[in-house]
């Protein structure tokens, strides 16, 4: 079975990927701990390509990466590409966003995900982008998910990502939508 390395050290992310790529005949693995990739691109796309390219080079295998984040209208798109570095942990990131939006009526936001797959030769062979629109609520709701999931209410369901079951989240999340776009290509590669 061919290996596909997820260019991430985030255990929550690999669990999400395993569910979404269930029908792809590959062994999905987290990147080795020894690999460090600096996310210094100025776009989500640049960061996704850089991560997949570096991990494919160092593992000599296929690699998949995404760069994703939340962009909040009233904060001029922040945290944006700095979403995972906006504070030291999920709880503090949520607290910071809620503090910065205190008293703000415009709470519109969107999650964005850029997904990239690189071949063992580091060539970009698949990529996609998807967004999910919603609002930042006043206080966290729900027990599931990770990151900003408890404060992001998806527009069509009126549920936070933390309140959604996997089926609902996979169908409407930014990452789920971006991955679905490249699944036909992955099925071909890993057939």
Curated annotation (Swiss-Prot):
Catalytic residues (UniProt): 67
Q: Kindly state which keywords UniProt assigns to this record, in alphabetical order.
A: Hydrolase, Magnesium, Metal-binding, Nucleotide metabolism, Nucleotide-binding
InterPro entries per record: dITP/XTP_pyrophosphatase, ITPase-like_fam, RdgB/HAM1
Instruction: Relay the cofactor remark from the entry.
Output: Binds 1 Mg(2+) ion per subunit.
Q: Where is the chain membrane-spanning?
A: none
The cofactor required is:
Mg(2+)
The protein's enzyme class: hydrolase
Q: Does the keyword Magnesium apply?
A: yes
| EC number in record | 3.6.1.66
Summarize where Mg(2+) binds, as residue positions.
38, 67
For this entry, list what GO says about its biological process.
nucleotide metabolic process; purine nucleoside triphosphate catabolic process
Which reactions does this protein catalyse? XTP + H2O = XMP + diphosphate + H(+); dITP + H2O = dIMP + diphosphate + H(+); ITP + H2O = IMP + diphosphate + H(+)
One example of the protein's molecular function in GO is:
metal ion binding
Cellular component GO terms, alphabetical: cytosol
Keyword Electron transport carried by entry: no
**Record-linked HAMAP family:** Non_canon_purine_NTPase
Family per record: Belongs to the HAM1 NTPase family.
Name the job this protein performs.
Pyrophosphatase that catalyzes the hydrolysis of nucleoside triphosphates to their monophosphate derivatives, with a high preference for the non-canonical purine nucleotides XTP (xanthosine triphosphate), dITP (deoxyinosine triphosphate) and ITP. Seems to function as a house-cleaning enzyme that removes non-canonical purine nucleotides from the nucleotide pool, thus preventing their incorporation into DNA/RNA and avoiding chromosomal lesions.
How is the subunit organization of this protein annotated in UniProt?
Answer: Homodimer.
Name of the featured protein:
dITP/XTP pyrophosphatase
Q: Which organism encodes this protein?
A: Prochlorococcus marinus subsp. pastoris (strain CCMP1986 / NIES-2087 / MED4)
